[in-house]
């Protein structure tokens, strides 16, 4: 394959692409982009699995000894899955992620900071748009690890920044 045909496009969650041509980025720099993309994907999948009440998928985003902190701590995949299973399903949520910043330090430690806008409403008896009954702006601080199965949360801490009612 010719040098002109070899191009790698990394699409980041922010919606822009980085075009990489041979010789432009080192393998190490390309690895950094791959880590950023994989960790951004993990952060976005957190929202989807949480909103769909997919407890196993949600827990799989964490390391075996992963920790969630939000006033208290939940440690381990099984405890994280159980927290979501304990949800009675009466409230519907949608987590909108944004402003995701993934950082890799000199020792390959991975951290991320992101915001989530969370809407909540009671589950409907019939289909159709729902009026949001409450909304939150949440800030997440993450410690992540690359594993054989991708980027995983080692620790996810969140705090509520804004809270409102409609």
What are these regions (language model features)?
Residues 23, 109-111, 135-166:
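Short beta-strand edge/turn micro-motifs at domain boundaries
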